Amino acid sequence: MLPLVCRTHEKPVAVSMKKMLLLVASVLLAVAVTAGCATLDAKQREWIFQPSNQSWGGAQSTSDMQDVWMDFDSQETGQSARLHGLWLAQPRADAPVLLYLHGARWNVSGSSARIRRMHALGFSVLAIDYRGFGQSSAGLPSEAMATEDAHAAWRWLAQQQPQAPRYIFGHSLGGAIAVNLASEVDDERGTMVEGTFTSMADLVGSFQWGWLPVSGLITQRFESVRKVARIGSPLLVVHGSNDSLVNARLGRQLYEAAQQPKRFVLVEGGSHHNTNAVGSPLYREAVASLFQLR
């Protein structure tokens, strides 16, 4: 039987995510054989992004954040698109600004606590929902669409804050989107990623059932390790030592593939979801020294 080659249009609990990835790995072959590449691609996009309008927090968690909207014409879908974002500004007009890119499953308001911690470091923060999440345009997200969404938000920041230095932050899956964006723009002052990975194939392969032969069937590849060397700004890679979803080894490998200046911070006791909180003092010191922000 000839190998199946799939081509795409493209260019929060850890346990449930692991179950999802196990489902991806165990079902990919069956879906590919019985339903073909289009269904395989769609199922992967559902499993990886888990798009939702659900959040960990309620309206109160974002009550002091401003709703903002970004409209653009999507080259990926050929349709008009609208992104919803949350804007948390600093009192200082010249404060650095940060584009916050969240991970899978929950909408942007589920990241409100992490948004506030980044704000406490001195950034004005724009956090967006990709299409398919929250109040952004409906649709099934993909790697290409999420990258396009990140670019749209980056342009919005440039238009709204033309004098401010701009930075990129991504958590988990958002870290892969952040690396992709940073590798394609040349006006970022720095990039931060937390709890992220080298590639989707490496992530699937890092689990105990990673021997399953599914790498060639992955359409949403998120190959950050191939892109990170193209980032021309300082890179901060943060990982929790107790991250049971994305092994810290993958974060270290991503860091090693990047150019200088860069820094790797391992937060002892940090999990996939609390590293940002547990490691707040380390974040503050690393941001100050690597990006020379006070």
Where would I find each of the regions flagged by the language model?
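Short alpha-helix in the alpha/beta-hydrolase fold that links the catalytic acid
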Residues: 114, 224, 233, 247-256
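Acidic catalytic loop of the alpha/beta-hydrolase fold
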Residues: 242-246, 273-274
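Short beta-strand/loop motif that positions the catalytic acidic residue
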Residues: 231-232, 237-239, 243
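Hydrolase active-site cap/lid region
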Residues: 175-233, 277, 281
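Alpha/beta-hydrolase fold nucleophile elbow
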Residues: 161-172
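Membrane-embedded segments
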Residues: 77-156
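Catalytic histidine neighborhood in serine/cysteine hydrolases
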Residues: 255-274
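An N-terminal hydrophobic leader/cap segment in hydrolases
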Residues: 32-74
